[in-house]
Amino acid sequence: MSLIPSIFGGRRTNVFDPFSLDVFDPFEGFLTPSGLANAPAMDVAAFTNAKVDWRETPEAHVFKADLPGLRKEEVKVEVEDGNILQISGERSNENEEKNDKWHRVERSSGKFTRRFRLPENAKMEEIKASMENGVLSVTVPKVPEKKPEVKSIDISG
């Protein structure tokens, strides 16, 4: 599978997947007076739709989520219904000083939840998570594949 960086948003996409969601939208921002008028809404959407990479190695499923500005106490990693990995978090606004004169407020607050159905080969009881520099890493070890038992048969004659 060939992965290339997208020139329309910096995300990665599979160039051979006709159903890839990473497509250029020529009408994005069309109904707003200015393309910049939609920027704060896009920032909120970027937070509420936290970007998560999921890769599979021979030993584990590894999830990496970009959560800039969040502390590990503001993030939850849970398993629901036995095989649904849920990553959620909440960013709150700082206390505003009513007497201050604000020139610009761009940082957003909000909640996000991302859910992933884990495959049958995931070891749910051994999931580990860590967070460093705003990047959450979740490692889900895999059950080793059972190799078929091969028995050699002597050929007589």
UniProtKB/Swiss-Prot annotation:
Residues 43-157 form the sHSP domain. Keywords: Cytoplasm, Stress response. Transmembrane segments: none annotated. GO terms for cellular component: cytoplasm. It is found in: Cytoplasm. It comes from the Eukaryota. It holds the Pfam family HSP20. Its main location: cytoplasm. Belongs to the small heat shock protein (HSP20) family. May form oligomeric structures. This is 17.6 kDa class I heat shock protein 3. It comes from Arabidopsis thaliana (Mouse-ear cress).
